[in-house]
Amino acid sequence: WAYAYLRMLHHKNPTLYFQTLLAEPAFLMPIVYTPTVGEACQKFGTLPFLPRGCYVSLADRGNVKAVLKEYADAMLPKDSLGNPQCQCIVFSDGGRILGLGDLGAWGMGIPIGKLDLYTVCGGFDPNKTMPVIIDAGCTDASGNSAKLTIRDHAMYTGMKQNRVKHTCPQGTEVNTAYYGPDSFIGEFMTAARELFGRSCLLQFEDFNSNDAFPLLEEYRGKFLTYNDDIQGTASVAIAAVLGGIKLQKPGCTNLLGELQGMRVLFHGAGSANIGSAELMIREAGVPATSVLVTNSRGVIWKSADGAQGNFRNDEQKSVAVEGEPQGYDRTDLVSIIKHHQPDILIGAVGRA
């Protein structure tokens, strides 16, 4: 209820709302964003407040620019020429809300909360930000951790249909509408850039990992965009590790050099840990042989030719160790730690 109260306060008096958050950020941000926002998203349509944000559904295909413009004309400030001003768009399809799974259009709490975080901690003008939900449907109760029948709830206002998916060449299921010459994501990204200019940040948020990685690779070179779950979390994780090394060795003048000599175990193989592992290997210079990543099947491994292994997608394959682990239980975390004796353990799993 504290979450709902703060959302109502924002609706009635945005200035007072942000002044309140700025007065007690350490106390209030966990209510506005994680961890409280997860429960709020599970009940989003039933909470007594008027949420802000723009909903763009597959039914808007071909008219996405008009939908964004209608929202922008009504909600965003204008420049001297009457053009709406937007610094940042955080958009999600609700496909993987935190560790809770597919919450569909009820995932709007995440873009709203993330932009509030950027205002309080990053100085973004809240009047020039835009939370967006890409409504591509929602899976049934099997698609979320609490087994909630969100899609069939009387108060659910999103598209009451299952997500249309196909198996991509890499063997994973992806949202069909996001790929190909008529990509819905491509139409959205292009429309946003045409309306708000190339300097408007377009941030992917809480997409399913199977979509998050290929979409980031597709658009990162074409738009001002990034994926917070992959890149943002990875940056913070590596910074935390370097900070830990500095605390442990106050006189160290080469933190990266110290990190490069350590063994690292990533428990969990979602967007956060895969992004962190790749950043550690590619940018921090940690040898790939010193990095282990686990998924639900244990330590991720691949054969020498890459044809076999227990990886689930190309991203997991990229951080897999070569050769099937032997001599210990590769599915048991304690056994893995005893055998490999990592210097650093980073956990990012939906449920431990």
Go through the PLM ranges and name each one:
Residues 1-261, 281-283, 287, 311-314, ...:
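Metallocofactor- and cofactor-centric catalytic cores in central/energy metabolism, strongly enriched
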Residues 93, 268-269:
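Glycine-rich Rossmann-fold phosphate-binding loop(s) that bind the pyrophosphate
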Residues 262-268:
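A short, small-residue-rich loop immediately preceding and capping a beta-strand
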Residues 267, 285-318:
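NAD(P)-binding Rossmann-fold cofactor-contacting core
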Residues 270, 297, 351:
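Flexible, active-site-proximal loop/turn residues at the rims of small-molecule/cofactor binding pockets
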Residues 273-274:
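N-terminal Rossmann-fold NAD(P) dinucleotide-binding loop
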